[in-house]
């Protein structure tokens, strides 16, 4: 099954994702500028290059998480051939050899392909996703070179590329192809222009409609996504590419500066609301969750000596939390050490999602079952896990620890602290030195 992969965090969010299936030819909903069914134009005395029109086509976000980042393509209108071809860099195939292994390793292969502009627009119209086009002011000879490049790029031996969620995705490929046609003027005008935003900023705001995915990405992404990015880098988002080229000036035929965008049109306007402009501030919610987990563990640990239900409850709470954090720690360590998912490298969340949670889980189970020998190791290890979580918080003032993970700390630290306190209480009950001896009867 072939799928339209889209951009950025969509692949990272779900990995294996279904895309749009191109629809049949449009039946009148798209303006007359689409000329797929018109005969070739016969020119008299004019260069065929001058008749080419190049558009940036941008598709707005959809409802699903993997659609929230938008999409884009390059549209070439060629009246000489009588064609309207849209070139899409966001395709992948579930049937590719070792597809799942490549995804896990961060070595996904995507490809580009041309489609009828009519059917392409119609597929997004049916999905209720906005479609905008911008006619670009590119010199005639460069338009022809761009068309040749895209046709070359579409050949089976040239179409595949190693997909990276932020640095080399379907939008950056469109950006780079246009920049190539303009002799590097897009990069020149945007590479040093700061945005004050980061890759994580955009990932958070665009996944805020799905809290589990939001949390998973907040956990999995490390330092690389928290540095400020330029306008050039921000064009990993199709809508950012659309915005930034709108304000860009390029060299015109007379040597002066002219706007890159000659005109803009909306081919279809979605009825869906726009994504939020900023990420949500959910730290209090995560803190509340951490306090509930930690408070429950501590309360159950205090009463576990007298009530069997409390011991069972303590075991359930600690099992769920420690299993989740231990497995999460394994995943984070694996992403950093064993894969090409560079966005997950140098992840401070390893101080919160601690691999030591797994041996602690085993010790806590033995402690609950009455093992006195497990009491001290369990208490020491639980305190160590909580201390490491606290260290993650105390390191935040230092400039080297700039990862945006306050919400994860707010969740993990109270939970680890509450479990450590509950384990310490149970360990004291199992320690023979703290058990009261039966009172001796007098005379």
Where would I find each of the regions flagged by the language model?
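Intrinsically disordered and other compositionally biased segments
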Residues: 11, 20-21, 438
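Intrinsically disordered, low-complexity coil segments
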Residues: 41-44, 50, 251-255, 306-313, ...
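Core alpha-helical transmembrane segments of integral membrane proteins
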Residues: 248-342, 352
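N-terminal secretory signal peptides that target proteins for export/translocation
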Residues: 1-14
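Bacterial N-terminal signal peptides
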Residues: 17-29
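Generic detector of multi-pass transmembrane helix bundles and their immediately adjacent loops
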Residues: 323-443
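Soluble extramembrane regions of membrane proteins in the secretory/endomembrane system
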Residues: 34-275
């Amino acid at each position: 099954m072939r799928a339209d992969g889209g951009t950025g965090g969509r692949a990272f969010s779900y990995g294996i994702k279904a895309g749009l299936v191109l629809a049949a030819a449009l039946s009148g909903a798209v303006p007359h500028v689409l000329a797929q069914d018109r005969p070739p134009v016969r020119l008299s005395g004019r260069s065929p290059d001058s008749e080419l029109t190049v558009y940036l086509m941008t598709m707005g976000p959809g409802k699903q998480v993997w659609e929230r980042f938008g999409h884009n393509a390059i549209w070439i209108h060629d009246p000489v051939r009588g064609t309207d071809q849209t070139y899409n860099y966001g395709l992948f195939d579930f049937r590719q050899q070792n597809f799942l292994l490549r995804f896990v390793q961060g070595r996904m292969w995507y490809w580009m392909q041309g489609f009828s502009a009519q059917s392409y627009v119609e597929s997004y119209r049916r999905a209720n996703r906005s479609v905008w086009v911008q006619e670009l002011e590119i010199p005639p000879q460069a338009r022809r070179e761009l068309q040749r490049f895209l046709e070359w790029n579409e050949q089976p031996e040239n179409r595949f590329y190693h997909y990276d969620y932020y640095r080399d995705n379907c939008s950056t490929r469109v950006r780079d192809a246009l920049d190539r046609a303009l002799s590097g003027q897009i990069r020149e005008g945007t590479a040093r222009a700061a945005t004050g935003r980061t890759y994580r900023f955009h990932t958070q705001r665009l996944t805020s409609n799905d809290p589990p995915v939001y949390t998973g990405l907040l956990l999995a992404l490390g330092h690389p996504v928290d540095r400020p990015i330029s306008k050039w880098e921000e064009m990993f988002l199709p809508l950012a590419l659309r915005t930034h080229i709108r304000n860009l000036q390029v060299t015109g035929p007379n040597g002066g500066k002219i706007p890159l965008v000659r005109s803009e049109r909306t081919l279809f306007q979605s009825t869906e609301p726009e994504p939020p402009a900023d990420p949500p501030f959910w730290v209090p919610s995560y803190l509340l969750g951490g306090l509930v987990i930690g408070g429950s563990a501590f309360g159950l640990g205090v009463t576990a000596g007298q009530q069997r239900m409390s011991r069972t409850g303590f075991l359930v709470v600690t099992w769920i939390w420690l299993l989740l954090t231990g497995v999460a720690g394994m995943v984070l360590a694996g992403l950093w050490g064993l894969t090409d998912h560079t966005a997950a490298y140098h992840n401070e969340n390893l101080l919160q999602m601690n691999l030591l949670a797994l041996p602690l889980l085993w010790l806590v189970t033995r402690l609950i079952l009455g093992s006195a020998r497990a009491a001290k190791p369990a208490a020491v290890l639980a305190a160590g896990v909580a201390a490491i979580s606290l260290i993650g918080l105390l390191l935040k003032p230092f400039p080297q620890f700039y990862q945006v993970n306050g919400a994860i700390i707010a969740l993990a630290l109270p939970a680890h602290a509450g479990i450590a306190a509950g384990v310490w209480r149970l360990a004291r009950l199992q320690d023979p030195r703290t058990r009261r001896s039966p009172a001796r009867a007098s005379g």
